[in-house]
């Protein structure tokens, strides 16, 4: 009789542990998903900030390029006119 109670007790513990283990697995899965989504949001915010910086830099870069190219325009026109 003691063996039967021991087996039933161990079965009860195993079932309880199995449910707890499944709950634990689900909780870990939810935490990992939450961390992944948080990281994705942070990366998205960083990308948005980089886009803003890039767009802010565009007028400066255009002016800088024009400043380098503008003195060469008369040379190009003169060279093409001689041909």
Curated annotation (Swiss-Prot):
Expressed in entodermal epithelium along the body column. One of its GO terms (cellular component) is extracellular region. Keywords: Amidation, Antibiotic, Antimicrobial, Immunity, Innate immunity, Membrane, Secreted, Signal, Target cell membrane, Target membrane. Its main location: secreted. It comes from the Eukaryota. Antimicrobial peptide with a broad-spectrum antimicrobial activity. Keeps its antibacterial activity under a wide range of salt concentrations that mimic physiological conditions of human blood, which is surprising, since Hydra is an obligate freshwater animal with nearly no salt tolerance. Does not affect red blood cells. Belongs to the arminin family. This is Arminin 3b. It comes from Hydra vulgaris. The lineage of its organism: Eukaryota, Metazoa, Cnidaria, Hydrozoa, Hydroidolina.
């Amino acid at each position: 009789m003691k063996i039967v109670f021991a087996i039933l007790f161990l079965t009860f513990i195993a079932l309880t542990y199995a449910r707890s283990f499944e709950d634990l697995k689900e909780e870990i899965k939810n935490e990992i998903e939450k961390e992944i989504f948080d990281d994705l949001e942070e990366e998205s915010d960083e990308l948005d900030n980089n886009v803003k910086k890039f767009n802010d830099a565009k007028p400066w870069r255009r002016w800088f390029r024009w400043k380098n190219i503008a003195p060469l325009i008369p040379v190009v026109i003169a060279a093409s006119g001689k041909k």
